[in-house]
C-alpha cells in the first residue's frame, strides 16, 4: 500500500450524534455545528511497513517496548501458545496484559508481523503516534478533523458510507460479528485486523474510517462542548 494524502475542503459540518443506539458514556452528543479549515489526511491508516520504516530511520522505541508489555485481545492469543499473561482489565477481562506485546510482536513475545505488512500498526500509544506523525511531516488530526474526514461528506449518517450497515449484503468494514467477546463469526472475512485497503474508501477517498483499529486524535477526550 503506497502512502498518499487526500486534500479535504473543510467547512461547516454537524459533529457528534444523538443516535439512541449508541453509548451515552462515549460523550458523542449532543450534535453541534463545527467548522474545520481545509487540511490533508493520509488516505490509509499507518501500516506496519510504514511504521517499520519510521523505526528504522529514527531508532524509536515505543511505549509498549519500554514497558515490555501491552494489552492483547483474548482471542488473538490462540496463535501464540507461549504468550505470558501478566494481568487483565477488571472491567473488560477480554483485554489481557501480555509480556512482550508490541507493534513488532502483536500477540506477545514470539509472534511476528509475517504477512501483515499492509495491516495497521497496533500497540501504538498517543506519544508513538505523535512521533510518527511528526517524522512523516504531519500531525495527528483533532477529533473534529477526524470526524469530518470519517463522514466522507455525508450529513449525520450512521456510517462513513451511509445508514445501512451492509448495503445490499455487502460488508463495508472489519468489525466484530457474533457473540462478543467469545465468538467472532468473521463474516466480513477478517477475524482481527485486515489490510488497510481491504474495503472501499468513503466519499473523500479515505480508507478504514470505521472498524479495523482504533485511531488517535490530537486533542483530549471531553464532554464540555463550547
Label each region the model flagged.
Residues 57-58:
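Non-catalytic, well-ordered alpha-helical segments in soluble enzyme domains
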Residues 47:
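Acidic-aromatic/histidine active-site loop/patch
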Residues 7-8, 14, 18-19, 24, ...:
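Functional-site microenvironments in short loops/helix caps that host divalent-cation chemistry
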Residues 31-33, 38:
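Well-ordered beta-strand positions in beta-sheet-rich domains
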Amino acid at each position: 500500500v503506497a502512502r498518499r494524502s487526500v486534500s479535504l475542503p473543510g467547512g461547516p459540518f454537524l459533529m457528534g450524534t444523538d443516535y439512541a443506539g449508541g453509548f451515552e458514556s462515549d460523550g458523542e452528543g449532543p450534535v453541534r455545528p463545527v467548522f474545520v479549515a481545509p487540511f490533508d489526511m493520509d488516505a490509509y491508516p499507518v501500516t506496519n511497513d510504514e511504521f517499520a520504516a519510521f523505526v528504522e530511520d529514527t531508532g524509536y522505541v515505543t511505549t509498549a517496548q519500554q514497558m515490555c508489555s501491552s494489552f492483547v485481545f483474548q482471542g488473538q492469543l490462540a496463535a501464540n501458545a507461549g504468550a505470558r499473561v501478566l494481568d487483565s482489565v477488571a472491567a473488560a477481562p477480554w483485554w489481557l496484559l501480555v509480556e512482550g506485546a508490541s507493534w513488532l510482536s502483536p500477540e506477545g513475545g514470539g509472534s511476528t508481523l509475517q504477512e501483515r505488512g499492509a495491516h495497521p500498526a497496533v500497540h501504538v500509544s498517543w506519544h508513538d503516534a505523535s512521533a510518527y506523525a511528526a517524522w512523516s511531516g504531519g500531525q495527528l488530526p483533532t477529533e473534529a478533523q477526524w470526524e469530518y474526514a470519517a463522514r466522507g461528506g455525508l450529513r449525520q449518517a450512521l456510517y462513513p458510507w451511509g445508514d445501512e450497515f451492509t448495503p445490499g449484503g455487502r460488508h463495508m468494514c472489519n468489525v466484530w460479528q457474533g457473540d462478543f467477546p467469545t465468538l467472532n463469526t468473521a463474516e466480513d472475512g477478517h477475524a482481527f485486523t485486515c489490510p488497510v485497503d481491504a474495503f472501499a474508501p468513503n466519499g473523500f477517498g479515505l480508507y478504514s474510517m470505521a472498524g479495523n483499529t482504533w485511531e488517535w486524535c490530537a486533542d483530549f477526550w471531553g464532554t464540555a462542548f463550547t
